[in-house]
Amino acid sequence: MKEDQVVQEESGFQDDEESLFQDIDLLQKHGINMADIKKLKSVGICTIKGIQMTTRRALCNVKGLSEAKVEKIKEAANKLIEPGFLTAFQYSERRKMVFHITTGSQEFDKLLGGGIESMAITEAFGEFRTGKTQLSHTLCVTAQLPGTGGYSGGKIIFIDTENTFRPDRLRDIADRFNVDHEAVLDNVLYARAYTSEHQMELLDYVAAKFHEEAGIFKLLIIDSIMALFRVDFSGRGELAERQQKLAQMLSRLQKISEEYNVAVFVTNQMTADPGATMTFQADPKKPIGGHILAHASTTRISLRKGRGELRIAKIYDSPEMPENEATFAITAGGIGDAKE
């Protein structure tokens, strides 16, 4: 009886995986020609769910797609995908696909409810030297290792906006986990973004890559999310445009994480908060990106310095974990538990 139950659960999981990666080529059976399908793929829309996640207006902006064609594509996609409503029980079953990637520290994992979650954006912010980039490098290795709940490990895409990625650091962390250096480095796809526009364009490539190797990639890292936006849009006059572009990019990230069941981890910087002096805070600083980034991130983690190599992580915002703190250490082998 139990074996039957396990088989049913596994087949249910596979059904969910298949519905997640329904290829856009299926539209051919519903009268959409291959030329139009290629146009959709060129902008990173590679799955039926991807069409559902894109507005008609955005589809009309794709070169060569008229309003009539877009309407036809939407109708065809709706025939292939299930209706929008599920019971809470059905949704909880679907949530079983969610996996967690360990941070390298048991205390930190406990704080996050198991680690960095898939189908979600996890943001870590803090001043310089609080461990943001070290955490990014550690996740590049731990995401490749088998974990709890049947997680088998996978590949990573790392988008670097500040030229802080160091392959040698991955070798040191790989030594700690007894993993082959070459294998670890081969499983990390690296891209350097130079402008906020370039950063957005790279996400089209990311979506195409996730689709091409469906289920192989497990983690997308952007270190750091706001650095290029700060440079490209300066002063209050450009703030509205910056926030609009940022909102579009974050919406794209959210959709990618859900469409391909990957974890998205982003780091963020801090800025002085002049208004907070009235609240008598000792060190008034806040993460940049404003309300748009605050609402887009599923889980927000605040990092601050402790004694020596110790760092303190605090849940700043989370839909399921309580506001709490954990102490971790930055070691030669990446993020680890603090020694008592």
Curated annotation (Swiss-Prot):
InterPro entries documented for this protein: AAA+_ATPase (IPR003593), Dmc1 (IPR011940), DNA_recomb/repair_Rad51_C (IPR013632), DNA_recomb/repair_RecA-like (IPR016467), DNA_repair_Rad51/TF_NusA_a-hlx (IPR010995), P-loop_NTPase (IPR027417), RecA_ATP-bd (IPR020588), RecA_monomer-monomer_interface (IPR020587)
Keyword terms of this UniProt record: ATP-binding, Cell cycle, Chromosome, DNA-binding, Meiosis, Nucleotide-binding, Nucleus
Biological process (GO), any one: spermatid development
Chief localisation class: nucleus
GO molecular function: ATP binding; ATP hydrolysis activity; ATP-dependent DNA damage sensor activity; DNA strand exchange activity; double-stranded DNA binding; identical protein binding; single-stranded DNA binding
Pfam families in the cross-refs: HHH_5, Rad51
Protein's cellular compartments: Nucleus; Chromosome
Positions that bind ssDNA: 230, 233, 236, 242, 311
Tissue expression: Testis.
GO CC, any one term: nucleus
Matches recorded under CDD domains: DMC1 (cd19514)
Binding annotation for dsDNA: 230, 236, 242
List of residues binding ATP: 126-133
SMART domains: AAA (SM00382)
Record has Isomerase as a keyword: no
Function per UniProt: Participates in meiotic recombination, specifically in homologous strand assimilation, which is required for the resolution of meiotic double-strand breaks.
Family to which this protein belongs: Belongs to the RecA family. DMC1 subfamily.
NCBIfam families on file: PRK04301.1, recomb_DMC1
Oligomeric form and interacting partners: Double stacked ring-shaped homooctamer. Interacts with BRCA2. Interacts with the MND1-PSMC3IP heterodimer. Interacts with RAD51AP1; the interaction is direct and stimulates DMC1-mediated homologous recombination.
Protein name, UniProt field: Meiotic recombination protein DMC1/LIM15 homolog
